[in-house]
Amino acid sequence: MSKIIILRGNSGCGKSTAAKALQKRIGNGTFLISQDYVRREMLGEKTGQHNQTVSLLKNLVMYGYQNCEVSILDGILSTGTYDDLFNLIAELYAGQTFAYYFDIPFEETLRRHNQKSYAHEVGEIQLRKWWREKDLLKNISEKMICKEMNTDDIVEMIYADITR
């Protein structure tokens, strides 16, 4: 039965790093869907434009459900904008959805962001503008990831959750 792992949270909190490490840990055939990559690289949409992104993410999630044992979806994935996507996930992956919210304080998120090679492209003012405090899903339960957890801790916790 197909499973989906959802990694959500504010920009710069470590979701994509954890998603890539988790894909490597789970192994061959693990389908990684990155909201940022789909929006910026595949579709060329700017921040605030999500018309095509939501539709393509829904198609990718369906592909993962039909063809992959495990799919990982990572991104900011704000409630409201992506509610249709989460409704689809709740329906398709009933009982096989593993969702995590990166509940990282802004100061820690900014510190992590500033360590990235592309940190100069997006500054503190923009990060604050994008910030959404505890933007939790309404129809899918999310396990919280706190700032004390490193990437290895996160990966091993999620791996244990999906292999029980």
Where are these regions (language model features)?
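P-loop (Walker A) phosphate-binding loop of NTP-binding proteins
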Residues: 10
